[in-house]
């Protein structure tokens, strides 16, 4: 696979990838894709060099977009962040406004990144499930990969909403852990 190297570098805004919103990053998280990128596996990075981090939560410093103003609390998840564009493992990020989401009421930056991309992905899947009228009365829900990031969040959300959950993991060392919760 080639040599992988890492370095810490002082950068200016001019060094960051293009975008119309500059965000002071308060929190980010380390995701599976970040680990793949850092190890040079998975063909995640589309350009080099690049700041890692596929999500971030913070506060708008400046914006050329009418949709955001200085002081707005925001988050960015996916959309090529940390793959094609400089990511959230930095003090400041510049991103396209089309990828920026206002921080939902009742959610703070730390909590948003504690859930991170895995939580966001699980929530989107469950939202789609509910849009397709998958109710608790229709029977149990099987969650594969239940010991991983997305799966574990999905299991917790589903069980908290009254669904019967069958948690499945290919990792035998996690079977007793999943049985302990008796979803």
Spell out what each predicted region is.
Residues 33-39:
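Cytochrome P450 core scaffold surrounding the K-helix E-X-X-R motif
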Residues 8-13, 57-59, 92-94, 100, ...:
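Conserved hydrophobic/aromatic beta-strand scaffold that supports enzyme active sites
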Residues 12-30, 41-81:
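Glycine-rich beta-strand-centered segment in the early N-terminal region that forms part
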Residues 113-183:
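Mid-domain Rossmann-like dinucleotide-binding core that forms the NAD(H)/NADP(H) cofactor-binding site
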Residues 82-97:
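A structural motif shared across PLP-dependent enzymes of the aminotransferase-like
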Residues 99-109, 136-139:
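Glycine/charged-rich beta-loop-alpha catalytic/anionic-binding loops adjacent to active sites
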Residues 72-73, 92, 140, 160:
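Residue-level marker of beta-strand positions
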